[in-house]
Curated annotation (Swiss-Prot):
One of the protein's GO biological processes: dTMP biosynthetic process
Gene: thyA
Protein name in UniProt: Thymidylate synthase
Native source species: Vibrio cholerae serotype O1 (strain ATCC 39315 / El Tor Inaba N16961)
Taxonomic path: Bacteria, Pseudomonadati, Pseudomonadota, Gammaproteobacteria, Vibrionales
Alphabetical list of PROSITE patterns matching this protein: THYMIDYLATE_SYNTHASE (PS00091)
Pathway listed: Pyrimidine metabolism; dTTP biosynthesis
């Protein structure tokens, strides 16, 4: 939690104002931030200086794992995080590849589970990684990549956290996640949870011990309309100790995650938090 607040303070103190063309807003921006989460010792990086709705972050990750491309499917899992980008993004609404209401296009999990091949077939990146790790194999290329420039025009949003690289040392599993852009007050709250949970889940379904998850952010920013709340409210609060995250031990396989797993299979204990803060969201 302290490393999150340190990054927020760094942006406030050292950030440079950048005009963001997509949103039409100014962002206070720094380049490069590295966060580390101790999954093996269950140090869950849930923000405590405001109430964090961790279930929505886990639901979104489940949707990515399942390769969902429709905001309605994400809502059914328990998150509305894709409603705006699917239905309120004017550029996407005018895009001929949009199939209709709630369609997200070929983003995130679609690329992870069905990356298009030139011959017309598809590559299931995630299944390959799970199969390898389950056999104790690390070919130094256990990489889940959502970043496909050849299909950006076929989706409502380029991926922000676009790469997850899994590594084995003995029977301990590690994760390096890379994020090109991060709305720190809003998005990082979710992204930290997802990096942690992704490693915890992958370790469980491959029979490995979770180690550390490394989270690199390239462009970390605070939007101008978020700055006052961050500087004058959230950064004035003292963090509480880290809570703990729990996964249903009956989850054993990738197929389990694809079929019957719901938010009821996850729990957080020891979570103390300050009052919620309503940060503006930029579509």
């Amino acid at each position: 939690m302290r490393q999150y607040l340190d990054l927020c303070q760094r942006i406030v103190d050292q950030g440079v104002w950048v005009e963001n063309e997509r949103t039409g807003k100014r962002c206070l921006t720094v380049i490069n931030a590295d966060l580390t989460y101790d999954v093996g010792n269950n140090q869950f990086p849930l923000v405590t200086t405001r109430k964090s709705f961790w279930k929505a972050a886990v639901a979104e990750l489940l949707g990515y794992i399942r390769g969902y491309d429709n905001a309605a499917d994400f809502r059914q899992l328990g998150t509305k995080t894709w409603d705006a980008n699917a239905n309120l993004n004017q550029a996407w609404l005018n895009n001929p590849y949009r199939k209709g209401e709630d369609d997200m296009g070929r983003v995130y999990g679609v690329q992870g589970r069905a990356w298009a091949k030139p011959d017309g077939g598809h590559i299931d990146q995630l299944k390959k990684i799970v199969d390898d790790l389950s056999r104790g194999v690390d070919d130094r290329g256990e990489i889940l990549n959502f970043y496909n420039p050849g299909e950006f025009h076929m989706g409502c949003l380029r991926p922000c956290m676009y790469s997850h690289h899994f590594s084995l040392l003995g029977d301990t599993l590690y994760l390096n996640s890379t994020q090109r852009s991060c709305d720190v007050p809003l998005g990082l709250n979710f992204n930290m949870v997802q990096v942690y949970v992704f490693l915890a889940l992958m370790a469980q379904i491959t029979g490995k011990k979770p180690g550390l998850a490394y989270h690199k952010i390239v462009n970390a920013h605070i939007y101008q309309d978020q700055l006052e709340l961050m500087r004058d409210v959230q950064l004035k609060r003292e963090p509480f100790p880290a809570p703990q995250f729990h996964i249903n031990p009956k989850i054993k396989t990738l197929q389990d995650l694809e079929t019957w797993v719901t938010l009821d299979d996850f729990d957080v204990t020891g979570y103390q938090f300050h009052d919620p803060i309503q940060y503006p969201f930029s579509v």
